[in-house]
Amino acid sequence: MIGVTLAVAVGGALGCLLRFATSNWISAHWPQHFYAATLAVNIAGCLLIGYLYGQFLLRPEVPLALRAGLIAGFLGGLTTFSSFSLDTLRLLESGQAPLAFSYLAFSVLGGLLATWAGLILTKL
């Protein structure tokens, strides 16, 4: 378990560093489009999690430390949007469309409301 934990920690650090570098680069080149960094890492993270998930389904022998390090660690550090997208896709694939769309709506609206609430808390 130590190996898996270490893989997640290292992957997370690398994902965070890539997100930070992406944000800095985009801010330096297109400061008026600050949101582009988040959009870029979210879309890239979704592409990568879909690819990795597919590869890991085809290759169940891939060690847990590598799977966890890449998905929970690297992509978790880069973006949590990729995990959210995969969860939604898996619900749809398993025939649970109503739950998938409820999860989608609650996640987006809940995230927006929680972000707003956090902002409001700073003003108290």
Swiss-Prot record:
GO MF annotation, one: metal ion binding
Regulation: Na(+) is not transported, but it plays an essential structural role and its presence is essential for fluoride channel function.
Annotated residues for binding of Na(+): G76, T79
Localisation: Cell inner membrane
Pfam families xrefs: CRCB
Keyword Ion transport attributed: yes
Keywords carried by this UniProt record: Cell inner membrane, Cell membrane, Ion channel, Ion transport, Membrane, Metal-binding, Sodium, Transmembrane, Transmembrane helix, Transport
GO cellular component terms listed in the entry, alphabetical order: plasma membrane
InterPro entries tied to this protein: FluC
Reaction equation(s) it catalyzes: fluoride(in) = fluoride(out)
Any GO BP annotation: cellular detoxification of fluoride
Membrane topology: Multi-pass membrane protein
Keyword Transmembrane: yes
Transmembrane intervals: 1-21, 34-54, 62-82, 101-121
Functional summary from the UniProt entry: Fluoride-specific ion channel. Important for reducing fluoride concentration in the cell, thus reducing its toxicity.
Family that this chain belongs to: Belongs to the fluoride channel Fluc/FEX (TC 1.A.43) family.
HAMAP family: FluC
Record-given protein name: Fluoride-specific ion channel FluC
